[in-house]
Design a protein with these regions (language model features):
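Transmembrane alpha-helices and adjacent helix-loop boundaries
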Residues: 1-196
Length: 196
Protein backbone atom coordinates (compact mmCIF):
# COMPACT_ATOMS: atom_id res chain seq x y z
CA UNK A 1 0.00 0.00 0.00
CA UNK A 2 2.83 2.40 0.90
CA UNK A 3 4.68 1.60 -2.32
CA UNK A 4 1.55 2.07 -4.41
CA UNK A 5 0.78 5.47 -2.88
CA UNK A 6 4.37 6.67 -3.17
CA UNK A 7 4.61 5.37 -6.74
CA UNK A 8 1.46 7.17 -7.83
CA UNK A 9 2.61 10.48 -6.35
CA UNK A 10 6.28 10.31 -7.35
CA UNK A 11 5.44 8.79 -10.74
CA UNK A 12 3.09 11.67 -11.54
CA UNK A 13 5.87 14.17 -10.86
CA UNK A 14 8.37 12.06 -12.80
CA UNK A 15 6.02 11.86 -15.77
CA UNK A 16 5.60 15.62 -15.83
CA UNK A 17 9.38 16.04 -15.61
CA UNK A 18 9.82 13.53 -18.45
CA UNK A 19 7.92 15.88 -20.78
CA UNK A 20 10.55 18.57 -20.20
CA UNK A 21 12.13 20.25 -23.20
CA UNK A 22 15.60 19.82 -21.68
CA UNK A 23 17.54 17.03 -23.37
CA UNK A 24 19.56 16.36 -20.23
CA UNK A 25 16.44 15.97 -18.08
CA UNK A 26 14.84 13.68 -20.67
CA UNK A 27 18.05 11.63 -20.94
CA UNK A 28 18.36 11.20 -17.16
CA UNK A 29 14.71 10.28 -16.67
CA UNK A 30 14.84 7.88 -19.64
CA UNK A 31 17.97 6.23 -18.19
CA UNK A 32 16.22 5.77 -14.84
CA UNK A 33 13.14 4.33 -16.53
CA UNK A 34 15.08 1.90 -18.73
CA UNK A 35 17.39 0.82 -15.90
CA UNK A 36 14.47 0.01 -13.61
CA UNK A 37 12.55 -1.71 -16.43
CA UNK A 38 15.48 -3.87 -17.51
CA UNK A 39 16.28 -5.08 -14.00
CA UNK A 40 13.96 -7.80 -12.70
CA UNK A 41 12.28 -6.81 -9.45
CA UNK A 42 13.81 -9.83 -7.74
CA UNK A 43 17.32 -8.66 -8.61
CA UNK A 44 16.49 -5.17 -7.35
CA UNK A 45 15.18 -6.69 -4.11
CA UNK A 46 18.42 -8.64 -3.66
CA UNK A 47 20.57 -5.59 -4.45
CA UNK A 48 18.73 -3.40 -1.96
CA UNK A 49 18.33 -6.02 0.77
CA UNK A 50 21.69 -7.77 0.56
CA UNK A 51 23.80 -5.18 -1.27
CA UNK A 52 23.05 -2.20 0.96
CA UNK A 53 23.51 -4.26 4.09
CA UNK A 54 26.87 -5.67 3.05
CA UNK A 55 28.46 -2.82 1.09
CA UNK A 56 27.27 0.17 3.09
CA UNK A 57 26.82 -1.48 6.48
CA UNK A 58 23.17 -0.44 6.55
CA UNK A 59 20.78 -2.57 8.54
CA UNK A 60 17.63 -2.58 6.42
CA UNK A 61 14.59 -4.77 7.01
CA UNK A 62 12.97 -6.86 4.32
CA UNK A 63 9.84 -4.74 4.50
CA UNK A 64 11.83 -1.53 3.99
CA UNK A 65 13.71 -3.10 1.08
CA UNK A 66 10.43 -4.12 -0.50
CA UNK A 67 8.98 -0.62 -0.09
CA UNK A 68 12.09 0.93 -1.66
CA UNK A 69 12.19 -1.46 -4.62
CA UNK A 70 8.48 -1.40 -5.37
CA UNK A 71 8.43 2.39 -5.05
CA UNK A 72 11.36 2.72 -7.47
CA UNK A 73 9.71 0.32 -9.92
CA UNK A 74 6.22 1.77 -9.56
CA UNK A 75 7.51 5.33 -9.89
CA UNK A 76 9.31 4.49 -13.13
CA UNK A 77 6.27 2.74 -14.59
CA UNK A 78 3.83 5.44 -13.44
CA UNK A 79 6.14 8.16 -14.74
CA UNK A 80 6.12 6.58 -18.17
CA UNK A 81 2.33 6.26 -18.10
CA UNK A 82 1.95 9.95 -17.17
CA UNK A 83 4.45 10.98 -19.84
CA UNK A 84 2.60 8.93 -22.43
CA UNK A 85 -0.77 10.36 -21.43
CA UNK A 86 0.52 13.94 -21.64
CA UNK A 87 2.36 13.52 -24.93
CA UNK A 88 -0.58 11.68 -26.51
CA UNK A 89 -2.70 14.82 -26.28
CA UNK A 90 -2.88 16.68 -29.57
CA UNK A 91 -0.64 19.73 -29.64
CA UNK A 92 -3.57 21.94 -30.57
CA UNK A 93 -5.00 21.38 -27.05
CA UNK A 94 -2.07 23.31 -25.62
CA UNK A 95 -2.12 25.89 -28.39
CA UNK A 96 -5.88 26.47 -28.10
CA UNK A 97 -5.62 27.05 -24.36
CA UNK A 98 -2.83 29.55 -24.88
CA UNK A 99 -4.78 31.28 -27.65
CA UNK A 100 -7.70 31.69 -25.23
CA UNK A 101 -5.36 33.50 -22.86
CA UNK A 102 -5.22 30.79 -20.20
CA UNK A 103 -2.24 30.86 -17.89
CA UNK A 104 -0.12 27.72 -17.74
CA UNK A 105 -1.75 26.63 -14.48
CA UNK A 106 -5.26 27.29 -15.86
CA UNK A 107 -4.37 25.42 -19.04
CA UNK A 108 -3.29 22.37 -17.06
CA UNK A 109 -6.14 22.55 -14.54
CA UNK A 110 -9.01 23.01 -16.99
CA UNK A 111 -7.78 21.44 -20.22
CA UNK A 112 -4.83 19.08 -19.84
CA UNK A 113 -5.32 17.31 -16.48
CA UNK A 114 -8.95 16.19 -17.13
CA UNK A 115 -7.92 14.63 -20.44
CA UNK A 116 -4.77 13.08 -18.99
CA UNK A 117 -6.77 11.53 -16.14
CA UNK A 118 -9.14 9.89 -18.59
CA UNK A 119 -6.25 8.29 -20.43
CA UNK A 120 -4.19 7.54 -17.34
CA UNK A 121 -6.55 6.13 -14.74
CA UNK A 122 -7.24 2.72 -16.30
CA UNK A 123 -3.52 2.20 -16.94
CA UNK A 124 -2.61 3.32 -13.42
CA UNK A 125 -5.11 0.87 -11.96
CA UNK A 126 -3.57 -1.86 -14.11
CA UNK A 127 -0.16 -0.93 -12.69
CA UNK A 128 -1.54 -1.25 -9.16
CA UNK A 129 -2.73 -4.76 -9.99
CA UNK A 130 0.71 -5.69 -11.34
CA UNK A 131 2.36 -4.32 -8.21
CA UNK A 132 0.07 -6.35 -5.96
CA UNK A 133 0.84 -9.55 -7.86
CA UNK A 134 4.58 -8.91 -7.81
CA UNK A 135 4.66 -8.56 -4.01
CA UNK A 136 4.89 -12.34 -3.75
CA UNK A 137 8.61 -11.96 -4.55
CA UNK A 138 9.33 -10.48 -1.12
CA UNK A 139 9.09 -13.93 0.40
CA UNK A 140 12.58 -14.55 -1.04
CA UNK A 141 14.12 -11.91 1.24
CA UNK A 142 12.37 -13.21 4.33
CA UNK A 143 9.33 -10.97 4.45
CA UNK A 144 6.32 -12.78 5.82
CA UNK A 145 3.42 -12.30 3.45
CA UNK A 146 0.64 -14.52 2.19
CA UNK A 147 2.91 -16.82 0.16
CA UNK A 148 5.31 -17.28 3.08
CA UNK A 149 2.46 -18.03 5.47
CA UNK A 150 1.12 -20.55 2.97
CA UNK A 151 4.52 -22.21 2.74
CA UNK A 152 4.73 -22.41 6.54
CA UNK A 153 1.29 -24.04 6.71
CA UNK A 154 2.29 -26.54 4.02
CA UNK A 155 5.55 -27.37 5.82
CA UNK A 156 3.81 -27.96 9.14
CA UNK A 157 1.17 -30.24 7.56
CA UNK A 158 3.30 -31.98 4.95
CA UNK A 159 3.14 -35.40 6.61
CA UNK A 160 -0.46 -35.36 7.80
CA UNK A 161 -2.05 -33.74 4.74
CA UNK A 162 -0.10 -34.65 1.57
CA UNK A 163 -2.34 -32.48 -0.62
CA UNK A 164 -1.88 -29.39 1.56
CA UNK A 165 0.15 -27.55 -1.08
CA UNK A 166 -2.71 -27.84 -3.58
CA UNK A 167 -5.26 -26.44 -1.14
CA UNK A 168 -3.03 -23.73 0.32
CA UNK A 169 -1.74 -22.44 -3.01
CA UNK A 170 -5.28 -22.67 -4.38
CA UNK A 171 -6.46 -20.50 -1.50
CA UNK A 172 -3.64 -18.02 -2.16
CA UNK A 173 -4.67 -17.91 -5.82
CA UNK A 174 -8.24 -17.14 -4.78
CA UNK A 175 -7.03 -14.40 -2.40
CA UNK A 176 -4.97 -12.70 -5.12
CA UNK A 177 -7.92 -13.05 -7.48
CA UNK A 178 -10.30 -11.49 -4.94
CA UNK A 179 -7.97 -8.52 -4.54
CA UNK A 180 -6.96 -8.02 -8.18
CA UNK A 181 -10.15 -8.87 -10.09
CA UNK A 182 -12.25 -5.97 -8.74
CA UNK A 183 -9.36 -3.59 -9.41
CA UNK A 184 -9.05 -4.93 -12.95
CA UNK A 185 -12.80 -4.63 -13.53
CA UNK A 186 -12.68 -1.03 -12.29
CA UNK A 187 -9.97 -0.26 -14.84
CA UNK A 188 -12.07 -1.82 -17.62
CA UNK A 189 -15.18 0.06 -16.50
CA UNK A 190 -13.35 3.40 -16.40
CA UNK A 191 -11.78 2.78 -19.78
CA UNK A 192 -15.17 1.96 -21.32
CA UNK A 193 -16.91 4.86 -19.54
CA UNK A 194 -14.34 7.44 -20.56
CA UNK A 195 -13.88 6.24 -24.12
CA UNK A 196 -17.27 7.77 -24.99
Amino acid sequence: VISVLLSMILGTFLGIIMTSQSKIVRLLTRFYLEFIRIMPQLVLLFIVYFGLARNFNINISGESSAIIVFTLWGTAEMGDLVRGAITSLPKHQFESGQALGLTKSQLYYYVIIPQVLRRLLPQAINLITRMIKTTSLVVLIGVVEVTKVGQQIIDSNRLTIPTASFWIYGTILVLYFLVCFPISKLAGHLEKHWSN
